[in-house]
Amino acid sequence: MTRERHRCPKSNTTGAAGNQAPAEGRAKGRKAREMAITEDRVGSADLANGGSTTMKVRKRNGDLEPVDVNKIVRAVERCADGLAGVDPMRVATRTISGLCDGATTEELDELSIRTSAAFIVEEPNYSRLAARLLATVIDKEVRNQDIHSFSQSVAMGVDEGLIGSDVAEFVATNARKLNDTIEADRDHLFEFFGLRTVYDRYLLRHPEDRKVVETPQYFFLRVACGLSASPEEAIRFYRLISSLEYLPSSPTLFNSGTSHPQMSSCYLLDSPEDSLDGIYKRYADIAKLSKFAGGIGVAWHRIRSKGSLIRGTNGLSNGIVPWLKTLDSSVAAVNQGGRRKGAACVYLESWHSDIEDFLDLRENTGDPQRRTHNLNLANWVPDLFMERVEKDWQWSLFDPAKVPHLTDLYGPAFEAAYLKAEEEGNYERQVPARELYSRMMRSLAQTGNGWMTFKDASNLKCNQTGTEGRVVHLSNLCTEILEVTDQDETAVCNLGSVNLGTLVTDGAFNFERLAEVVRLAVPFLDRVIDINYYPTHEASKSNSAWRPVGMGLMGLQDVFFKLGLPFDSPEAREISARISEEIYFNALWASTELAQAAGSPHDNYALTRASKGDLQFDLWGVEPSDPSRWDGLKARIAEHGLRNSLLIAIAPTATIASIAGCCECIEPQVSNLFKRETLSGEFLQINRYLVRELQQRGLWNEAMANRVKMAEGSIQEVEDMPEDLKEVYRTAWEIPMRSLIDMAADRGAYIDQSQSLNLFMESPTIGKLSSMYLHAWKAGVKTTYYLRSRPATRINKTTIGGPIGGGESVEKPSFTDAEAVSCSLENPEACEACD
């Protein structure tokens, strides 16, 4: 039965311990507490007024009315129905105590929400209570604009220029069916911070008064309608995303169904040609792409290095830094649809002779004209460089004006061309490979930037590079997208992620439902390609010909919590690999169905490795779990082809994971204690899975909560914490990075693009980082993302002598950076410099 109007259900009040009281006792207790609160607040003389007080609130129409204490209590109780451990009276008491005479009803609503959120640190179900209270506020805000159905919300959006004409016509034609689809109770699936994120950032707002014109469920259905050709499709997709089992990426959520349907997440641009026209065209392209919420990756390999002769003027080049400084300012100036700052990552090949200046761009000291604090940086590293690091050989640095062909080569062809250029003496200078590698490690340790991405693995294991001349020149802003680019093609990708945490039922992971979710989602990812607004011709051309998409995942840590598995256990590693295999298999199957329905594969199918029978695991040399099943799929691919050249990419999912109420992508949790920030304030939250475990064992109380808070996120030293829980609830700082890398490599055989692989090191040293990234390269990982550290001080203490702070001094290091690299490579299991 459809429920358009959002109301919290009738209350079955629960006590602080979560036990349901008998109805009679509940009523008596409630009456007594109401009287106590009212008496304390306004005096016993007001009790005769039935809980009304001399304090007044201002209604939305401007009228003043007395505060009705009992009305506040009942409103909270309705929203607390079925929430064990939640005390509505406590919330009401705190709300009333913070109320000021003459406050507006909006302020009263916001105060009750903030009050509920403040208790989340003690009992996770207060998050659901705060979310339900917020949902009622959103509902009132929408209805006060005379919007009472989904179709009316869309009509309002059309009047204000927010909704696209095609979607407006689609909704008007199918209004009754679509209105009946709304399931308002699905708002109860949200945790508070997820719904707050939706309210603050995603719901469409009136352009003048900034009131929201859609509820969360209208929002989901609007997104679905923007990607659907029939009401049946829209209903199917609405039910999928409103269940939070799957969510499209932020650009799709922002823009689907709107007058500017730019729904792609990522744009990858080849290096500009080495000319003024080429560079300034690239600036313009990036600004256009960034304007509508696209994240940017751009290569800078072709731009000549510092000191290079400019024949047209007989002058010398200043190198890449001034150009990147201009790009830095441009990126910061472009606001992505008013929702977030523009963002870009610049990639540079390790043989470029400006590489050392490039690595300094994010430093906090030095000439500000040679620093770019808005750009992210990534190293595009060939295997030959890593091999020379291992062998402790020299590395030659080149001016791309002299060796322009190196940018478009990889694997054996690159190595041959590099060696030839080296033999001919075309290099600008030579440096010890380990010295340059240590500078890369230092950049990572000090800034978290200068990500290590591996050129040869990215090309040799990419489906799009099945024909000579097709080259991957870079990854994207978050290092999970790997697609070919050239001057005429800007690579594009549309993303979405399965919420794995919703797929654990009765103590087991539901692989059957995973398959269903993936097969439902892929057609809608593909649909974005045809509907999308493309800011540049090069982006439209590339996306239409290759039709790549990026199906990802989030909530892997939630799966392990629900199954009681340590993140790095053999069982967790096996489940992680199987999940990736199932997603890849079912995404490919769905793509063959799309090709069959369309009557043809994507335009460039003949250029791919899949057209020759090679899938991702073949390129890794890995045998899947059930080869006969894969043989059947390969036969389907041979018959129908694939509608999409690429299908799998694991994005960071920071924002949509917050909406879904799960942990980000493939990452372990970084803490058991979180500080959540919203537009209405900051709130503490303790890992809800940990709290539930402790409650079930009778160990959760105020003292335990305080011990967990005092431990600042780690529970390893918390008194009375069971040892098995310490294993399961370790943080990213307490899990060996070798395990994280090995799990990434396991799933990599089923990821035809890449994965945003953050690595964590509490106190990074050159030696530790050297060993870690060498292991990632040897494991076949294509890309890595941020290095996360806390605090970023150990690197300074181990490499810099002299006074620190208030005159203290530290012992001079026993190892130089180069010695630390050498030690870590030659003694990987027992490196003194890594201690």
Task: Name what the model sees in each region.
Residues C8, E24-N49, R794-D835:
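Acidic, low-complexity intrinsically disordered tails
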Residues R26-T53, V86-L221, Y238:
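Core nucleic-acid recognition elements
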Residues E169-T197, T479-V484, L525-D530, E623-P627, ...:
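Catalytic alpha/beta core of large soluble enzyme barrels
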Residues T181-T197, R201, S228-S259, A287, ...:
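Conserved oxyanion/phosphate-binding beta-strand-loop segments in alpha/beta enzyme cores
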Residues S127-V158, V381, S458-D486, V549, ...:
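Terminal amphipathic helices with adjacent charged low-complexity linkers/tails
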Residues V517-S540, P548, P566-T653, K709, ...:
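Internal maturation/activation junctions in enzymes
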Residues L204, Y218, V223-G312, L316, ...:
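Function-dense linear segments that define catalytic or interfacial modules
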Residues D360, L375-M440, L444-T447:
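Polar, glycine-rich mid-to-C-terminal structural blocks
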